[in-house]
Amino acid sequence: MALPNAIFFVQNAFRELGKPPHEVKLGSLFDGSGTMPLCAAMCGGHPVWASEVEPYPIAVTRTHLPHMKHLGSVTEIKGSKIEPVDIITFGSPCQDLSIAGKRAGLKGERSGLFREAIRIIREMLAATNGRYPRFVIWENVPGALSSNGGEDFEVVLNELLCLREFTGGGAAKFIRQHGKWRNFANYGAVAYRIVNAQFWGVPQRRR
C-alpha cells in the first residue's frame, strides 16, 4: 500500500480511538517494509512489533524503526504472548487472490495465511478480555472482492465480525443474498474501501 493511502487508514483509526496519539500502539503482521508502522510513528504513535520473514524488508525497518520488535513468522506467533496493541494491521499474501494469479483464493497456501492473522487477533482478544486490539486494518488487492465469486470476501467479513464474540458482542454471521449484503449494520463497525494510488500523490495507477 502506498504511504499516503496507509496514512489515511491509520489516521482514522487514531482518531476513532479517542486517546492521545503518544499512547497508541500498533502491531503489523505480514509487515513488508514497514509502511503501517511508519504511519503510526508519523501520527505520533508507537509501532511496537512487526512480523516479517524476508531479510531485506526487515533490514529497512530495523534502520528506520530501530525500537520496533521483530517477531518472525506469523505461524510461530501466539497472540496471547505478545504485547497487546490498539491497532493490528496486516497485508496477508495476495497471490492467490489476485486476478493475475491462478486464484486459488483463501484455500491457497499463501493467501490462506490470512487465517493466521485472525488466529493471532483472536488469541490477543481472549487474553485481554476483549480489550485489545481495538482496530484491525487488512490491506489487499481488489481481486480479494471477486475471488471465488465473492465467497472469499464473505469469509473475510465473517471472520472479522466473529471477532466480536471476544468483546462481549456475541458471534455474528454476515449473510450474502442475491449479490447484496444484509445482517451487517447491527453487528459492529466493519468497512472496506478501494483506493487508487494515483489520486493520493503517488505516480502510479495502483488499487
What are these regions (language model features)?
Residues 77-85, 97-207:
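Class I S-adenosyl-L-methionine
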Residues 32, 51-52, 73, 134-140:
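Active-site beta-strand/loop signature of hydrolases that rely on acidic residues for catalysis
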Residues 66-74:
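Conserved SAM-binding strand-loop segment of SAM-dependent methyltransferases
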Residues 61-62:
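Conserved SAM-binding loop
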Residues 87-89:
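N-terminal Rossmann-like NAD(P) cofactor-binding module of classical short-chain dehydrogenase/reductase
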Residues 1-53, 57:
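S-adenosyl-L-methionine
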Residues 92:
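Glycine-rich, N-terminal phosphate-binding loop of Rossmann-like dinucleotide-binding domains
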